[in-house]
UniProtKB/Swiss-Prot annotation:
Free-text comment on the cofactor: Binds 1 zinc ion per subunit.
Disulfide-bond pairs as recorded: 130-152
Glycosylation sites: 120, 167, 178, 290, 371
UniProt protein name: Adenosine deaminase 2-A
Chief location of this protein within or outside the cell: secreted
Residues annotated as signal peptide: 1-24
Gene responsible for this protein: ada2a
Organism: Danio rerio
Family note: Belongs to the metallo-dependent hydrolases superfamily. Adenosine and AMP deaminases family. ADGF subfamily.
Cellular component, GO, one term: extracellular space
SUPFAM superfamilies (alphabetical): Metallo-dependent hydrolases
Gene Ontology terms for molecular function: adenosine deaminase activity; adenosine receptor binding; proteoglycan binding; zinc ion binding
Binding site for Zn(2+): 105, 107, 349, 434
Length: 503
């Protein structure tokens, strides 16, 4: 964490001192002082490494140098092409072992690997598949053949289908392709943002019938927590649509059932993994809803928050920002909690756009005016200096999701990501993964690697990684005492990680 005003005064003073004494031959001592001051402002720049950490940092810098000097630099490449190289990197291997704290920006239907979804869930009894006219698939669990619909004229029991065909591996692979964005040639497959977003939202529709089956819903969440835990994450905040879940006989469960199920699964997972801190839900709705629907949804969010205070963290809008309604359109609905004296924290997606000067481009400012707790993505923040300063002074962090921003075509080369500037300035932020399963990424390690290597090059060090991990807990919605306990637990894990990495 940076002391804003003292740091700024030191910066201005040193600049004036240097300029006042410029005589054509710069003083090397002042140059060194400027370099040191700039380094201190970076994310992690004010963290003092102990002797063991310094040894590990020396090792890390050598590993980084190797990746930087390799013929292909992964952050400069599309993730789908770079993943193979990243997986072979010793830096990535170290980051995987590193305790990363919390994942604060993750979506419910994209947190579990699609391999598990296909090879576990679609092999369960009573799972039906439909091959649609749009060359996609739909799934549903049913005690008998499901009724036909406008998008599915014929359903096939998957168990029977697998018994009839010889190559079940190819069938499973086709399902996996329908559940991810991965392709060998992403530039050709997704020539623009609208194309990739259309495919992106289609993926969620494919997963919908699987994940909303009530028994799978619970198993899916448990598996998601397990996969994040295995990636050395101790706490998760999940953006969740909380759709109706269904039973085998077609009965539907409401949002209260889903929240209670989340609470049950999280408690069960914590019982089995005592060092896991927990998980909370940020209730979300698509930003294409109208004003009347927004009022109803915010009222629903307040009820959920009242009924499930331990698991319900707050509210957000999701969906392609450029094609959705701007936050200001929902001003009446978003003002309801304050008008009623109710605390409903907001966690708005804002600035996930490169459309400067549009109504959507004002979402960053409006998010702060509505007192958002964190800002999802904030890709456009660097183009709004006043809003950026507001966010810094309000200590509102940006949830940066590097791979998502690249795959959804906001940036091609991650060295050019605006977060590189934010981290150089020590702006409050966290690194998260958004939709790792859809991108074929690990829970968080791939995004950490891309940020660490792409945003700062050789200037980032072990202190950068340590502060990012600490930030993830500092900016979580954990109550103060639990937050302090979580940070203490993280530091114990961190010391163990440093020790073991030096063996």
């Amino acid at each position: 964490m940076h002391v804003l005003f003292l740091g700024d005064l030191m910066w201005i003073y040193l600049l004036l001192l240097c300029c006042a004494s410029c005589n054509g031959r710069p003083d090397p001592r002042k140059r060194d002082a400027l370099i040191g001051l700039e380094a201190s402002r970076r994310t992690g720049g004010d963290i003092t490494l102990n002797e063991r950490e310094k040894l590990l940092d020396g090792k890390l810098q050598k590993l980084k140098q190797h990746d930087m000097e390799a013929g292909q630099f992964p952050p400069s490449m599309h993730f789908f092409k770079a993943k193979r190289l990243i997986d072979q990197s010793p830096v990535f291997n170290l980051i995987q072992k590193m305790p990363k704290g919390a994942a604060l920006h993750v979506h419910d239907f994209a947190m579990v690997s699609v391999d598990w979804l296909v090879k576990n869930v679609t092999y369960r009894e009573n799972c039906y598949v439909c091959f649609t006219d749009k060359q996609t698939v739909q799934f549903i669990f049913s005690s008998g053949p499901p009724a036909s619909s406008s998008y599915c004229s014929s359903w096939t029991l998957l168990r029977s289908l697998r018994e009839k065909i010889k190559n079940t591996t190819e069938l499973d692979n086709s399902f996996i392709r329908n559940l991810t964005l991965f392709t060998e040639d992403p530039d050709r497959a997704y020539p623009n943002q609208d194309t990739v977003w259309e495919r992106f939202e289609q993926v969620f529709l494919v997963a919908y019938g699987l994940v909303t089956y009530a028994p799978v819903f619970k198993d899916y969440l448990y598996e998601g927590l397990r996969q994040f835990y295995e990636d050395n994450i101790m706490y998760v905040e999940i953006r969740a649509l909380l759709p109706q879940t269904y039973e085998l006989d077609g009965r539907l469960n409401d949002k209260d059932w889903s929240m209670a199920a989340c609470q049950e699964v999280v408690n069960q997972f914590k019982k089995h993994h005592p060092d896991f801190i927990g998980a909370r839900v940020i209730f979300t709705v698509h930003r294409k809803i109208n004003a009347t629907e927004a009022v109803k949804t915010v009222e629903e969010a307040m009820i959920l928050r009242r009924n499930f205070p331990d698991v319900m963290a707050g509210f957000d809008f999701v969906g392609q920002e450029d094609l959705g309604r701007p936050l200001w359109y929902f001003k009446d609905a978003l003002s309801l909690p304050e008008d009623k004296g109710f605390n409903l924290p907001y966690f708005f997606h804002a600035g996930e756009t490169d459309s400067q000067g549009t109504d959507v481009d004002q979402n960053l400012m409006d998010a702060l005016l509505f007192n958002t707790t964190r800002i999802g993505h904030g890709f456009a923040l660097a183009r709004h200096p006043v809003v950026k300063e507001m966010a810094r002074k309000m200590d509102v962090p940006i949830e940066v999701c590097p791979i998502s921003n690249q795959v959804l075509k906001l940036v091609s080369d991650l060295r050019d990501h605006p977060a590189a500037v934010l981290m150089a300035e020590g702006h409050p932020l966290v690194i998260s993964s958004d939709d790792p399963a859809v991108f074929g990424a690990t829970a968080l390690s791939h995004d950490f690697y891309e940020a660490f290597m792409g945003f700062g090059g050789m200037s980032f060090n072990l202190g950068t990684l340590k502060e990012l991990a600490l930030n993830s807990l500092r900016y979580s919605t954990l109550p103060s005492q639990r937050k302090e306990e979580a940070i203490d637990a993280l530091l114990v894990k961190w010391d163990k990680f440093v020790w073991e990495s030096l063996l």
